[in-house]
């Protein structure tokens, strides 16, 4: 056909050649309606997708949800959503912090990516949905199809428990499983990539036609001049301050660190976390290699690349956090009857892993294995995340951390945490550290600056609240601020004492309560202060206060939540069930937020 009789350009002809008969029929109707000046119905262009899927009856509506603590689950869910959009699927993408849990019963397809926090709990943003599904008012999900990917850490006993719980409960409530749940360890990329591919294929199989391009819109965006720093591409910052902020007699070593961000373009908000890529202690590496009788220059293969074992242990492999998988793998190579018996008992193995660093396994059960065998037993080294303790409104192009240095002894041998020890002991003044910002939209100050806030933290859990008050003061926020803080001793462990006193003088810390657990015979904790201040706390809640909790997930955060439920039930004259619902409503309204670890 010549161009004189065909008004379509060659590019359009090529595009049309790819369409199947059903899509051509639909496109014909669309074009006819346009020619008649009528509403053509479905919009075939999508700024965020390369295609729109057309079915004989109605398009698939897929909702991709994520429950993320550090951002990994969010990233995987974004990848899945983009893949589905590229295949023409109608996708709604939401993090659970912005999702109304009660609408779950209206969904057609739900694809959930969730991490796990604490002792197997759902991440903060996933709690409302978790509680709804496991509560008395759980919906009937007979019309739902679902798939779940869990992200976790095999070094913890409740590996991917949140994903397992969601997956099980969906099915119990009548939903149909689109495909089997997948569980991914810290090095989750390969598992996540396969799960995404399997999900895409399963969703495509559910559609009436194969995914194909109907129309595409390519929107050009201006290139960003600033480098996009991330976990995979960290910024190399200078450590400009390393100051111990606990007293000499304290049982704890807590450091205040400041990093220079000048010229980096790196941005963060109060409530975010900072990722730190640390290196393992060279002395620890030498101890390990000596025990295994391995030369530091012996070559090993990691992801298809060759490097010496010392370099691999320095910056590529996890050498401090023990796991059941490591001990089991080492037992097979060591051929030690006592160790073999130990790994045959799940409880004994879990207790041993919890109490024994990797290097001390080598002390307990000496064996001669190759450098490659040892490297194959270890997980990739991962960055450590710390709550940021500064506001850029106050400190400019700096970022501050408050870090408790992990120091302990095992069988008389001194051990140190990988990142805290790296920062405290091995990075010199103006030394370089690879860092990145991990946004935490689940821990944000209220947009309405007149709202009061209640900050509850213990130990280094005070870090984000220093950032919060710096931010509130910089913005001249009118809302009242109440700090409830706990630590061991007033004299040695009152972190940032002078700064809190200054906030009081400046009129930005209106109420404060402190729990010093070891300053009297009977231990007092922050949850005790919550109960003691029950009436005032309830009054603040009635005034619209936002409640923030930062600290240990396994004990402190649970005890604080139980205390809050007691206060709500007593002061609000509510049943335990109604108190639970009240607190869950606060959570959904972003008035109860936790940063726990």
Curated annotation (Swiss-Prot):
<feature type="binding site">
    <location>
        <begin position="402"/>
        <end position="404"/>
    </location>
    <ligand>
        <name>FAD</name>
    </ligand>
</feature>
<keyword id="KW-0521">NADP</keyword>
<feature type="domain" description="Flavodoxin-like">
    <location>
        <begin position="62"/>
        <end position="200"/>
    </location>
</feature>
<feature type="binding site">
    <location>
        <begin position="517"/>
        <end position="518"/>
    </location>
    <ligand>
        <name>NADP(+)</name>
    </ligand>
</feature>
<comment type="similarity">
    <text>Belongs to the NADPH-dependent sulphite reductase flavoprotein subunit CysJ family.</text>
</comment>
<dbReference type="InterPro" id="IPR039261">
    <property type="entry name" value="FNR_nucleotide-bd"/>
</dbReference>
<comment type="pathway">
    <text>Sulfur metabolism; hydrogen sulfide biosynthesis; hydrogen sulfide from sulfite (NADPH route): step 1/1.</text>
</comment>
<dbReference type="GO" id="GO:0070814">
    <property type="term" value="P:hydrogen sulfide biosynthetic process"/>
</dbReference>
<feature type="domain" description="FAD-binding FR-type">
    <location>
        <begin position="232"/>
        <end position="446"/>
    </location>
</feature>
<keyword id="KW-0560">Oxidoreductase</keyword>
<dbReference type="Pfam" id="PF00175">
    <property type="entry name" value="NAD_binding_1"/>
</dbReference>
<feature type="binding site">
    <location>
        <begin position="523"/>
        <end position="527"/>
    </location>
    <ligand>
        <name>NADP(+)</name>
    </ligand>
</feature>
<comment type="function">
    <text>Component of the sulfite reductase complex that catalyzes the 6-electron reduction of sulfite to sulfide. This is one of several activities required for the biosynthesis of L-cysteine from sulfate. The flavoprotein component catalyzes the electron flow from NADPH -&gt; FAD -&gt; FMN to the hemoprotein component.</text>
</comment>
<protein>
    <recommendedName>
        <fullName>Sulfite reductase [NADPH] flavoprotein alpha-component</fullName>
        <ecNumber>1.8.1.2</ecNumber>
    </recommendedName>
</protein>
<dbReference type="InterPro" id="IPR017938">
    <property type="entry name" value="Riboflavin_synthase-like_b-brl"/>
</dbReference>
<dbReference type="Pfam" id="PF00258">
    <property type="entry name" value="Flavodoxin_1"/>
</dbReference>
<dbReference type="InterPro" id="IPR001433">
    <property type="entry name" value="OxRdtase_FAD/NAD-bd"/>
</dbReference>
<dbReference type="GO" id="GO:0005829">
    <property type="term" value="C:cytosol"/>
</dbReference>
<feature type="binding site">
    <location>
        <position position="354"/>
    </location>
    <ligand>
        <name>FAD</name>
    </ligand>
</feature>
<feature type="binding site">
    <location>
        <begin position="68"/>
        <end position="73"/>
    </location>
    <ligand>
        <name>FMN</name>
    </ligand>
</feature>
<dbReference type="InterPro" id="IPR029039">
    <property type="entry name" value="Flavoprotein-like_sf"/>
</dbReference>
<feature type="binding site">
    <location>
        <position position="597"/>
    </location>
    <ligand>
        <name>FAD</name>
    </ligand>
</feature>
<feature type="binding site">
    <location>
        <position position="320"/>
    </location>
    <ligand>
        <name>FAD</name>
    </ligand>
</feature>
<keyword id="KW-0285">Flavoprotein</keyword>
<dbReference type="GO" id="GO:0004783">
    <property type="term" value="F:sulfite reductase (NADPH) activity"/>
</dbReference>
<keyword id="KW-0028">Amino-acid biosynthesis</keyword>
<dbReference type="GO" id="GO:0010181">
    <property type="term" value="F:FMN binding"/>
</dbReference>
<keyword id="KW-0249">Electron transport</keyword>
<dbReference type="GO" id="GO:0000103">
    <property type="term" value="P:sulfate assimilation"/>
</dbReference>
<dbReference type="InterPro" id="IPR017927">
    <property type="entry name" value="FAD-bd_FR_type"/>
</dbReference>
<feature type="binding site">
    <location>
        <begin position="417"/>
        <end position="420"/>
    </location>
    <ligand>
        <name>FAD</name>
    </ligand>
</feature>
<dbReference type="GO" id="GO:0050660">
    <property type="term" value="F:flavin adenine dinucleotide binding"/>
</dbReference>
<comment type="subunit">
    <text>Alpha(8)-beta(8). The alpha component is a flavoprotein, the beta component is a hemoprotein.</text>
</comment>
<feature type="binding site">
    <location>
        <position position="559"/>
    </location>
    <ligand>
        <name>NADP(+)</name>
    </ligand>
</feature>
<feature type="binding site">
    <location>
        <begin position="384"/>
        <end position="387"/>
    </location>
    <ligand>
        <name>FAD</name>
    </ligand>
</feature>
<dbReference type="InterPro" id="IPR001094">
    <property type="entry name" value="Flavdoxin-like"/>
</dbReference>
<keyword id="KW-0198">Cysteine biosynthesis</keyword>
<keyword id="KW-0288">FMN</keyword>
<dbReference type="InterPro" id="IPR023173">
    <property type="entry name" value="NADPH_Cyt_P450_Rdtase_alpha"/>
</dbReference>
<feature type="binding site">
    <location>
        <begin position="151"/>
        <end position="160"/>
    </location>
    <ligand>
        <name>FMN</name>
    </ligand>
</feature>
<dbReference type="Pfam" id="PF00667">
    <property type="entry name" value="FAD_binding_1"/>
</dbReference>
<comment type="similarity">
    <text>In the N-terminal section; belongs to the flavodoxin family.</text>
</comment>
């Amino acid at each position: 056909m010549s161009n004189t009789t065909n008004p379509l350009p060659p590019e359009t002809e090529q595009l049309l050649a790819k369409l199947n008969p059903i899509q051509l029929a639909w496109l014909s109707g669309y074009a006819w309606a346009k020619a008649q000046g009528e509403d053509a119905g479905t919009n075939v262009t999508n700024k965020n997708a390369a295609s729109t899927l057309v079915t004989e009856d109605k398009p698939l509506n897929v909702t991709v949800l994520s429950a993320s603590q550090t951002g990994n689950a969010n990233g995987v869910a974004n990848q899945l959503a983009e893949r589905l959009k590229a295949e023409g699927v109608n996708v709604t993408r939401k993090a659970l912090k912005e999702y109304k849990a009660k609408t779950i019963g209206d969904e057609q397809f739900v694809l959930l990516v969730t991490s796990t926090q604490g002792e197997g709990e759902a991440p903060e943003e996933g709690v409302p949905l978790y509680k709804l599904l496991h509560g008395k008012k759980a919906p009937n999900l007979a019309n739902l199809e679902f798939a779940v990917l869990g992200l976790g850490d095999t070094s913890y006993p409740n590996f991917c428990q949140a994903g397992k719980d969601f997956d099980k409960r969906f099915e119990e409530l009548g939903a149909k499983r689109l495909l089997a749940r997948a569980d991914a360890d810290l090095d989750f990329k390969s598992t996540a990539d396969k799960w995404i591919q399997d999900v895409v294929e399963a969703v495509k199989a559910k559609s009436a036609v194969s995914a194909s391009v109907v129309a595409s819109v390519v929107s050009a965006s201006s290139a960003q001049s600033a480098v996009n720093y991330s976990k995979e591409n960290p910024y190399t910052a200078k450590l400009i301050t390393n100051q111990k902020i606990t007293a000499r007699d304290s049982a704890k070593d807590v450091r205040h660190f400041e990093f220079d961000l000048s010229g980096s373009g790196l941005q963060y908000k109060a409530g975010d976390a900072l990722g730190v890529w640390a290196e393992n202690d060279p002395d620890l590496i030498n101890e390990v290699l000596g025990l295994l009788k391995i030369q530091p220059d012996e070559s090993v293969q990691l992801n298809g690349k060759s490097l010496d074992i010392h370099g691999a242990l320095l910056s590529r492999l996890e050498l401090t956090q023990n796991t059941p998988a490591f001990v089991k793998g080492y037992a097979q190579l060591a051929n030690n009857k006592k160790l073999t018996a130990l790994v045959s008992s799940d409880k004994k193995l879990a207790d041993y892993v919890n109490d024994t660093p990797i290097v001390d396994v080598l002390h307990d059960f000496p064996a001669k294995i190759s450098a490659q065998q040892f490297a194959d037993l270890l997980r990739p080294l991962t960055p450590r995340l710390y709550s940021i303790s500064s506001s850029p409104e106050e400190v400019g192009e700096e970022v501050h951390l408050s870090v408790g240095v992990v120091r302990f002894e095992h069988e008389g041998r001194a051990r140190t945490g990988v990142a805290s020890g790296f920062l405290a002991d091995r990075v010199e003044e103006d030394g370089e550290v690879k860092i990145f910002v991990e946004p935490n939209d689940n821990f944000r100050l209220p947009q309405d600056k007149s709202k009061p806030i209640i900050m509850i933290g213990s130990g280094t859990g005070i870090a984000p609240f220093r950032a919060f008050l710096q931010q509130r003061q910089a913005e001249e926020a009118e809302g009242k601020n109440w700090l409830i803080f706990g630590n061991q001793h007033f004299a040695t462990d009152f972190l940032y004492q002078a700064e809190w006193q200054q906030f009081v003088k400046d009129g930005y810390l209106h109420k404060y309560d402190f729990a010093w657990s070891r300053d009297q015979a009977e231990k007092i904790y922050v949850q005790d202060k919550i109960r003691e201040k029950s009436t005032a706390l309830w009054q603040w809640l009635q005034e619209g206060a936002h409640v923030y909790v930062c600290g240990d997930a396994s004990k402190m955060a649970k005890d604080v939540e139980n205390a809050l439920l007691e206060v709500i039930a007593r002061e609000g004259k509510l049943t335990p069930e109604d108190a639970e619902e009240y607190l869950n409503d606060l959570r959904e309204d972003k008035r109860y937020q936790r940063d726990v670890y």
